Amino acid sequence: MNVKLGKYNQLEVVKEVDFGVYLDGGDDGEILLPTRYVPEGCKPGDVLNVFLYLDNEERLIATTLQPLVQVDEFACLEVAWINEFGAFLNWGLMKDLFVPFREQKMKMQKGRKYIIHAHIDEDSYRIMASAKVEHYLSKEHPDYRLGQEVDILIWQKTDLGFKAIVENKFSGLLYDNEIFQPLETGMRLKAYVKQVREDGLSLIHISEPTRRG
């Protein structure tokens, strides 16, 4: 069994210790779930749904906290602090999510929110984020049907309207003249497919299409 870093995993409790419980990580060995996250009544043999990430000493560790983003997902997160290496985002866990300067489209500012993509850095095997989200959108042609309901994340304002990330995978566009409610970056909404262009861009709108017949 191989566990998935930056994702939820169903892992079995193998033993209890004074500072938490250890979970069966298969080929990755035993993984600590610290006491503060151990459910009441938890015992060896129980299977827990936990999120796995690296602690400050780069050790694989488990938590029952719910992060604001998982690996291979997009989200709008706030900058908690900045140092000489990059920015650190609040994603709901004890250890903040790192965005190196090379992955920032513009220099990030503390307290501001940005659309990012979370991924595992190939060189360091750490969970990192990138504000260059266009690099992580699928180049495949979406196979959507007209009027199909999709989940979208509002990405950025353009001269034509708002760019959106569709189903955590594709690029979409809402035209200004078809928007009848206030929108802002980071909003998550239900939308409907109006058209998929030859270049793969999904034209979407928020109002549910009128059904005929």
Stretches found by the model and what they are:
Residues M1-L5, D55-A75, R102-Q104, S130-L146, ...:
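Short boundary/loop segments of OB/S1/cold-shock single-stranded nucleic-acid-binding domains
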Residues M1-N49, L54-N56:
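N-terminal, positively charged regions that mediate nucleic acid binding
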Residues L11-V13, G45-E58, L77-W81, R112-Y125, ...:
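Flexible glycine-rich surface loops and low-complexity tracts that mediate binding to linear polymers
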Residues F19-Y22, F85-F88, L160-K163, L201:
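Short aromatic-glycine-enriched beta-strand elements
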Residues G29-C42, K95-K107, F170-P182:
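Beta-strand/loop nucleic-acid-binding surfaces
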Residues V69-Q70, C76-H141, W155:
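Intrinsically disordered, low-complexity linker/loop segments enriched in Gly/Pro
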Residues R145-L201:
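Aromatic-anchored, glycine/proline-accented short structural segments
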Residues I204-G213:
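Single conserved hydrophobic/aromatic residue that forms the stacking wall/gate
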